[in-house]
Regions:
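A general structural motif
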Residues: 19-21, 59, 132
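Structural core segment of the AMP-binding/adenylate-forming
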Residues: 82-138
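A general structural detector for well-ordered alpha-helical segments in enzyme core domains, enriched
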Residues: 10, 65, 118-122
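A short N-terminal helical cap/helix-turn-helix that marks the beginning
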Residues: 2-23, 42
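Domain-wide signal for the mature, well-folded portions of proteins, strongly enriched
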Residues: 8, 27-28, 38, 125, ...
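Conserved AMP-binding/adenylate-forming core of the ANL superfamily
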Residues: 23-78, 95-100
């Protein structure tokens, strides 16, 4: 890699320069789990391929909502950007009405969330968001 010109170039640069076994570390059920630079890239590519299989097009908007700092958020973000789509990061603590407003304004077609609580909040306003095709939990 010669130069970073896009956000999704960063994981590839990181792997080439540092190739760390602990690019990300997240606590799951009280245990710390590491994700290497290579795993990060592989998982982001898998996300990109899955989104393309779902029909994502360049400039589509995809929302991401997480209640805490998680490896999956970063993987989703890079996976989204690699497809040419745009990430719409959202705070987990906003109201259902704010979710509906932001998702409508951004015209998000998919939303990825970290847990059932956020999923349920979105489900309660889903009928107000015509562009939203699906909500997924990571």
């Amino acid at each position: 890699m010669k130069k970073i010109t896009r956000l999704f170039d960063i994981p590839y640069y990181q792997k080439e320069k540092f190739n760390t076994a602990e690019a990300f570390v997240t606590k799951y059920n009280g245990k710390w789990v590491s994700t290497s630079s290579q795993e990060y890239i592989i998982k982001a590519i898998q996300v990109s391929k899955a989104l393309m299989a779902l029909g994502i097009q360049k400039n589509d908007k995809i929302a991401i909502i997480s209640t805490n700092n998680r490896t999956e958020w970063n993987i989703m973000d890079i996976g989204i950007l690699q497809t040419g789509a745009q990430s719409v990061p959202m705070y987990p603590t906003i109201s259902e009405e704010d979710y509906a407003y932001i998702l409508n304004h951004s015209e998000a077609v998919f939303c990825f969330v970290s847990d059932a609580e956020i999923f349920n909040k979105l489900q309660r306003v889903r009928n107000q968001i015509p562009s939203l095709k699906e909500i997924y939990c990571f």
